[in-house]
């Protein structure tokens, strides 16, 4: 599926019936925040996630496969390289804690006011978010993700260590952990 060629999904079809769904980026930001909330029991979380996405919940046992697909913008998770798998995974952004930086980046680069924009599809938002460049949030995500190795020059180690401290997120889930949480919810409901 291509977001440029194909119509962006806005509903779920099951058993000949079309179920409208929330597709605006703000609702899916809420979805991600709820997904990463470790204080909510999984059954309560799954119900609340469904209620957030669907005004009327489809009775399909495969619904979570669709939700996972939609959350990933119609793409399967990229296969991580062996090197990436062996590296310690760190969350590099948080919609809750980086909201100001994300807002500023969209204003600066795309001239989009994320506060007042009436609607922006989740897939459009995520595409633009991934393509951000030359802005503070990209620098911050770079600091958070860059690994400090033995080969890193001492001056850069000190700088990176300080930037990691300054821009540290409270315990946040990585992208892989978010997908794993969604899969765990899906599996718990398919008992």
Predicted regions and their residues:
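Short, surface-exposed, low-complexity cationic segments
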Residues: 25-42
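Charged interaction scaffolds used for protein-protein
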Residues: 1-18, 26, 36, 47-191
């Amino acid at each position: 599926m291509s977001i440029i060629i194909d119509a962006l999904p806005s509903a779920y079809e099951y058993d000949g019936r079309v179920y409208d769904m929330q597709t605006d980026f703000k609702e899916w930001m809420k979805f991600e925040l709820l997904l990463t909330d470790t204080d909510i029991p999984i059954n309560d979380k799954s119900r609340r996630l469904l209620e957030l996405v669907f005004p009327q919940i489809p009775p399909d046992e495969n619904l979570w496969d669709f939700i996972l697909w939609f959350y990933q913008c119609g793409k399967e998770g990229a296969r991580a390289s062996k090197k990436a798998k062996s590296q310690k995974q760190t969350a590099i952004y948080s919609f809750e804690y980086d909201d100001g930086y994300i807002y500023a980046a969209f204003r600066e680069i795309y001239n989009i006011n994320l506060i007042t924009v009436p609607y922006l599809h989740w897939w459009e938002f995520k595409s633009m978010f991934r393509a951000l460049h030359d802005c503070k949030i990209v620098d911050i995500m770079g600091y958070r993700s860059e690994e400090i190795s033995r080969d890193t020059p001492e001056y850069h180690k000190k700088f990176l260590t300080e930037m990691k401290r300054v821009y540290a997120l409270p315990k946040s889930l990585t992208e892989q952990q978010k997908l794993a949480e969604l899969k765990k919810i899906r599996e718990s409901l398919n008992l």
